[in-house]
Amino acid sequence: MLMSRALCRSWLPQVARRCHANVNVPILRINSGHPAARSCRQIHSNRKQSSNLKPTTGEPAAAEQNTPVPVNNVIKAVAFTGAFTVGCFAGATILEYENTRSLILEKARQARFGWWQSRSLADRDYWTQIKQDIRRHWDSLTPGDKMFAPILLCNLVAFAMWRVPALKSTMITYFTSNPAAKVVCWPMFLSTFSHYSAMHLFANMYVMHSFANAAAVSLGKEQFLAVYLSAGVFSSLMSVLYKAATSQAGMSLGASGAIMTLLAYVCTQYPDTQLSILFLPALTFSAGAGIKVLMGIDFAGVVMGWKFFDHAAHLGGAMFGIFWATYGAQIWAKRIGLLNYYHDLRRTKQK
C-alpha cells in the first residue's frame, strides 16, 4: 500500500475506550519542502453514554451492528449542512468586504498622517512598540500560516478541554459527532476541532500546515475559511449518512475531513506537483496520483466496512475538495450580487 493513515478521522469507543491515534504515520512531503500526510478521524461505538472514558489498549473499537439512526436526525444533519455552508460563504463575502474597506481606509489614513507613522520607535511608548513588533511579525507570515495559526489555536483549546474531568460530558455531547445522539447539528461542526490523542492532533495539524499555504494563496483567506469550515461539516454529514445507511451509529471526531478537502483541492489544482514519502525521498509520485490512491483506500474502506477510520468522512472531504477545485471559481464569482447588496445596505445605515 502506497500510504497509510497519518491523518485519521477514526472511530472512538464511546464508553469503554479512550480516543487513541496509536498508528504508524508514513508521512508525505512535497518536494518543495512542505510536508504532507494522510488524514484520520476517530470513531466510537454507540453504547450507552458515560463521561468515564477508560484507557484503551490501542485496539480500535468496532461500531455496534444494527444500531438505527433516527430519520429526523438525518434530516436535521442535511438541513444544518446546507444552512451552515450558505452561512459560511455569505459570512466570508461580508468579511471580504469589511477587510477590503478597512485596508482602503488604513491606506488613506497613512497617506494623510504619514508624518506620525515616520516617527522613530524611540519616541513611542513601550506598549506601542510591542504592538508594532507583533504586527510586523504577523505581516511576515505566509498566507497559509495566517490561516493555520487560529485554526491550530482552536484545536489546542479543544484538546485542553478534553483534559478537564468536569468537561468530559460536555465534550462527548458537543465535540463528538454521533448521528444517534440527541444533539446532532452543532457537534458536526465542533467535532472538526476536537482531538483526544496528542498523536491524532499532531498528525492532522502537521498535514494541514503542509497544504495550507498552497490552498490559501490559491483561494484567498476569506474563501479559504469558508471552504475549510464548510468542508468540515460536509464531511461530518457524509459520516452521518454512511452510519445511517449501515445502522452503525457511533461517535467521530477530528479535523481530517476538512483537511482532506485542502489536500484534494491542492492535488487537483496542481496535479503535477511531485510528492515524496518522508524518510523515503527517492520515492516520488505526482499529487494527482497520490489523491487517487488515498480516495481509493477510503472507497475500499466504505465498501468493505472497515472500522478503524471514518472512511466516509475522509471520502466526503476529498470529494468536496475536488468539487471546489473544479467549480469553486464560478461559484465564488456569484458573490458579487451579495457584495453589492451589503454595500448598499451598509451605506443606507450610515446615512
From Swiss-Prot:
The chain crosses the membrane at residues 74-94, 147-167, 183-203, 224-244, 248-268, 277-297, 312-332. Residues 51-73, 168-182, 245-247, 298-311 are mitochondrial matrix. It is a multi-pass membrane protein. Residues 1-50 form a transit peptide. The active site is at residues 256, 314. It is an enzyme of class 3 (hydrolase). GO terms for cellular component: mitochondrial inner membrane; mitochondrion. Its EC number is 3.4.21.105. InterPro entries: Peptidase_S54_rhomboid_dom, Rhomboid-like_sf, Rhomboid_protease_S54. Residues 39-65 are annotated as: Disordered. It catalyses: Cleaves type-1 transmembrane domains using a catalytic dyad composed of serine and histidine that are contributed by different transmembrane domains. Keywords: Hydrolase, Membrane, Mitochondrion, Mitochondrion inner membrane, Transit peptide, Transmembrane, Transmembrane helix. Disruption phenotype: Lethal with most dying before pupation. Mitochondria in the testis and skeletal muscles display morphological defects indicative of defective mitochondrial fusion. The few escapers that survive to adulthood, display neurological defects, male sterility, and do not survive for longer than three days. Also displays photoreceptor degeneration after prolonged light stimulation and abnormal photoreceptor synaptic function which specifically affects both the generation of light responses and the signal transfer across the first visual synapse. It is found in: Mitochondrion inner membrane. GO terms for biological process: mitochondrial fusion; protein processing; regulation of mitochondrion organization; regulation of protein targeting to mitochondrion; signal peptide processing. Residues 95-146, 204-223, 269-276, 333-351 are mitochondrial intermembrane. Interacts with Pink1 and HtrA2. Belongs to the peptidase S54 family. This is Presenilins-associated rhomboid-like protein, mitochondrial. It comes from Drosophila melanogaster. The lineage of its organism: Eukaryota, Metazoa, Ecdysozoa, Arthropoda, Hexapoda.
